[in-house]
Amino acid sequence: ESNGFLPLSACSVSSGEKLYYVNNCKSVFYARIGSGSLENGVRLIVAHVDSPRLDLKQLPLFESSGISYFKTHYYGGLKKYQWTALPLSLHGVIYKADGEKIDICIGEDDDDPVFYITDLMPHIAKDQYDKTLRDAIPGETLNIVNGSVPFDDEKGSVKHNILCLLNEKYGITERDFITAELSATPAQRSRDVGFDRSMIAAYGQDDRICAYPAFTALLDSDDSDKTRIVVFADKEEIGSVGITGMASRSVEFFLRKLCDKTGADYVRCVENSVCLSADVGGAFDPCYADAYEARNSAYIN
């Protein structure tokens, strides 16, 4: 909105307007309305903004051998071994029984605690070394450590102490996890890579590295007779399923809303439209050359 975009519900969809539509708090549509009819077609760029992560289960909190954990299930195509001994942050929302929404972001500020998934020490990992890379870290062991201090005294429960801390800070109970959506992601900020700072290391570049320039291109574009639309889609990492993924009819419904407001024919709009799917590919890595087809790979230089 600081760039002049208004909710679709507040717009007449007239030439020059900049509008947005949020689909179930997960995907977003941005549009700059052109001077021409929508029946002449629109120009779309679609990128996804979800990335591999660890989602907390419905009742994730449990205690084992004096340590409190979150039980997780992984979202998207992640390599499980990359998520152990890595500082993790917690993001998401919790809906309390009274309907209050609580936004959660823990682990991004320097003063925040972080969370970890443990791994075996090298000198006791003989059996682990004998396993394949796929099986060395079972998904069932991706449990996130969240505390180790017992409640009140040494005989108390660590889990109970964690619940007390959560209740004190956020006013939630264990049952509130059922109506929560919480995810763990790497607690690492974006950094330049190399003496020449020519590369960027950051979580979620697939596909936010495409989403960001798509949006800035929309901001920087000149007025046009064509309506330009950028879609930030969800659920790509798990097959674009659900009401916020591209397998849904969300794009159709958005275009129909625009056409209905302007009296344009939806079928003609679609027939004359062009869509660019903006997603990433792996650049050729000489350290793993056998995994690539060298003549048809992207290169950094």
Language-model regions, residue ranges each:
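N-terminal hydrophobic/helix-forming segments and targeting peptides
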Residues: 1-301
